[in-house]
């Protein structure tokens, strides 16, 4: 199924959806979602069904234990109530932990077995990695934890819960949805603005097919070459191309599926917010893969930072290092834990683990030094408030992020270190030629224009201008001209051929 076929499937399903009575539209969406999944990953169907069923049953069991405990409390004497509450909570915790271990364990076995075997030099087994398993597992476990924490009641209808887990646009590469944000929308959807939805889909296709897939040969030429082939200058060009390719590939795919969801009147969670305009690494991660960051914040960072062991450690640190250090310590340790897990989420290999730790340690040091930064900013208020300093912070963050991208893209951590070392030790600027980068002069010009257009639209968005909303509000002839012209441009300028399909999304098999 090509990207255009995916878009066409979305339009066809939306047409059937809106032709049906409102009360059965969710059934149409469920059938469309399972039809899509079966067509793309039939062998993976039992796994998504298993996650759906076990999560649904576990959430109901947690609710029943809570209801039973409340009934017993009403009839119990005062001195026994505390014990009854504690017993009910222990049973709920046991159910929750069993479901977490089962589903995350299944994900770990399927996703990391070959990586772990590689540590010991064993050959890969090639286990099946079901479509979207990371995304639907995290989404389902978030729902389970919310039910356990009493945020909302569980969904009693298995089919309706199955729709939440399997909603087909977000299965490809997210975003990771929250049940309380999607429940009502999946039941009936909201207002549909077809021009806005189409423009978002078109923009996603343009980012993916015109920019990301055109930058891909440059990235491959640099990072997939034998070690020592290129000097540091080519490494810099390669990582800059990768920063463009990865952003346009991932955010382009998100825009496409978010546009498809809007055809049903469903608004998916924002997953990217112009990350390369970030002024710090923390700001970057609040703009990049927002739904994963929010998941980690709510279900890992806060529970860890507020846990009793960390609180005791913070109190112990207060006496030796001061109150400011003690206050920042839980956040520092939490960031290291979260980004270690984010690194492993990408893969259990040295490059991903070090990439996660690189980000986590920088954020940890930033948290610990925050009081000093604050005092420095107060002393240099005029400088830090200037436009030039803002630009400096954006460029500094971009450099920090791109250093991390070396670990993300290289095959091993050692390769990443060697490539970065070559930037200073062996630049070899003469190697930077289009023929070495595997891209023609015409493709280079198209890529440059595409990146400039992306930068212009992003800059407008950063300044509060809604380009899509502005275009969708134009007169009908202008809207049609933009949509038709954009479609023709993507058809003419998009990269076509074998290997350039939705399967080539970087995050397709996460």
Question: Positions of the model-derived regions?
Answer:
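Membrane-embedded transmembrane alpha-helical bundles that form the catalytic cores
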Residues: 1-509
């Amino acid at each position: 199924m090509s990207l255009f076929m995916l878009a066409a499937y979305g339009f066809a399903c939306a047409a059937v959806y809106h032709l049906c009575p409102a009360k059965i539209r969710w059934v149409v969406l469920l059938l469309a979602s399972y039809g899509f999944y079966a067509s793309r990953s039939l062998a993976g169907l039992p796994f998504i069904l298993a996650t759906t069923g076990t999560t649904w049953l576990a959430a109901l069991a947690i609710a029943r234990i809570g209801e039973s405990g409340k009934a017993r409390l009403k009839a119990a004497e005062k001195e026994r109530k505390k014990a009854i509450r504690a017993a009910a909570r222990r049973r709920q915790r046991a159910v929750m932990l069993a479901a977490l271990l089962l589903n995350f364990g299944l994900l770990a076995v399927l996703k990391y077995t070959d990586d772990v075997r590689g540590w010991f030099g064993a050959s890969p087994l090639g286990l099946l990695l079901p479509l979207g398993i990371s995304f639907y597992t995290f989404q389902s476990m978030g729902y389970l934890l919310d039910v356990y924490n009493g945020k909302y009641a569980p969904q009693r209808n298995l089919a309706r819960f199955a729709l939440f887990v399997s909603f087909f646009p977000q299965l490809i590469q997210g975003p990771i949805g929250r049940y309380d944000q999607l429940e009502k929308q999946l039941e009936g959807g909201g207002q549909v603005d077809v021009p806005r939805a189409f423009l978002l889909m078109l923009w996603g296709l343009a980012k993916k097919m015109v920019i990301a897939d055109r930058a891909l040969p440059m990235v491959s030429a640099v990072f997939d070459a034998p070690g020592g082939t290129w000097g540091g200058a080519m490494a810099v060009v390669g990582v800059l191309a990768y920063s463009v390719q990865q952003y346009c590939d991932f955010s382009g795919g998100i825009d496409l599926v978010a546009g498809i969801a809007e055809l049903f009147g469903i608004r998916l969670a924002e997953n990217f917010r112009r990350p390369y305009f970030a002024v710090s690494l923390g700001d970057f991660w609040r703009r990049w893969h927002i739904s994963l960051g929010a998941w980690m914040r709510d279900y890992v960072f806060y529970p860890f930072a507020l846990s009793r062991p960390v609180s005791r450690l913070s109190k112990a640190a207060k006496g030796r290092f001061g109150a400011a250090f003690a206050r920042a310590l839980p956040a520092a340790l939490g960031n290291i834990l979260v980004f270690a897990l984010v690194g492993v989420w990408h893969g259990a290999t040295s490059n991903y683990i070090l990439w996660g730790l690189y980000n986590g340690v920088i954020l940890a040091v930033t948290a610990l030094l925050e009081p000093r930064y604050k005092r420095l900013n107060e002393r240099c208020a005029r400088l830090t408030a200037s436009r030039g300093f803002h630009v400096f912070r954006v460029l500094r963050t971009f450099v920090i992020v791109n250093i991390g991208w070396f670990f993300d893209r290289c095959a091993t951590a050692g390769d990443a270190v060697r490539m970065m070392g070559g930037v200073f030790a062996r630049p070899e600027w003469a190697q930077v030629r289009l023929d070495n980068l595997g891209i023609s002069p015409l493709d280079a010009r198209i890529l440059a224009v595409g990146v400039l257009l992306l930068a212009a639209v992003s800059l407008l968005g950063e300044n509060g201008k809604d380009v899509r909303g502005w275009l969708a509000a134009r007169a009908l002839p202008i809207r049609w001209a933009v949509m038709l012209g954009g479609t023709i441009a993507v058809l003419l300028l998009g990269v076509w051929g074998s290997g350039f399909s939705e399967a080539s999304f970087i995050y397709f098999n996460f």
